[in-house]
């Protein structure tokens, strides 16, 4: 059964196509400790994405459907669907796709959200998360994408894939919608006990992301605070502010209050994970509530229904900005390989966009640029 064309069109495809199929002789590490594949044919490689088919509330159905959408939208990617082979293969039968683009990799275990992440990573060696991250570690995949356990992904990213030399803490960095487009919120859940030096690195990595992935030249960097004045804030913010001010690698504009974030007051919004996660969850909740309230309001009377028809095109565009599925997942920056965490309730469009997001990271050599900046 082919994927619905309307749904397929909703999956963003904006990256330049330039990777082709090849084979590798070996996997080595560059001078920064980054794992690289050695090409024996002299050609560029297809981008290979390992996808956790068993992670998330809607697995495996929506995960498999999203992977198929991504493969249908680009011919230069190869997707490894990792999970219980018989279950994933059965889902694949529902779709039309090129067999050479999607391969099922068997993994007999699943890490559940409620499991202690450290113990799960150590004991469930044949889980979809561990198998996928090991593929990245060995250079068999360029990126790993999962809607599964956040804790397991954070632990596995550091323990299995490993940090780039010089990176103190890898942050989670999702894009959030604003009046002016999008901003990067960094960190939103990985490091609740961050130090000033960590936040400075977050600012540098976030600037690289926004310049090379989103295309914003000299992105504005701000730190989340309770006021615009330099002397305001808790101890962490007060200690970090002068360090960011002195950093010549970023365009630091000072503090940003939460109310300024939706207006696009900065391109890179720096915070420790507790504050960042509260902002992200509030953002998602308010967005979902607004969409629901607007839809309900349009159906209260005949007059409102007629008015809704008149404003429908503009309203649809506006409300779409609050749809998290349009922005893909949150990369765990600063690792030796690409790891992207998608929402636990992700459906096919968000899965598709997260996979294509991995392609952009690879094409723009984000990890290499991060290494060079440290």
Regions found by a protein language model. Give the residues of each.
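Short, Lys/Arg-enriched N-terminal segments with co-localized hydrophobic residues
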Residues: 29-45
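Phosphate/nucleotide-donor binding subsite
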Residues: 97-141
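Short, glycine-rich nucleotide/cofactor-binding loops
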Residues: 51-61, 190-200, 341-346
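N-terminal phosphate-binding or glycine-rich loops at protein starts, especially the Walker A/P-loop
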Residues: 45-89
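Short glycine/serine/threonine-rich phosphate/pyrophosphate-binding segments
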Residues: 59-63, 126-139, 143-157, 164, ...
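Glycine-rich phosphate/diphosphate-binding loop of Rossmann-like nucleotide-binding domains
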Residues: 61, 78-80, 86, 192-258, ...
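Glycine-rich phosphate/nucleotide-binding loop
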Residues: 158-171, 175-185, 265-269, 273-374
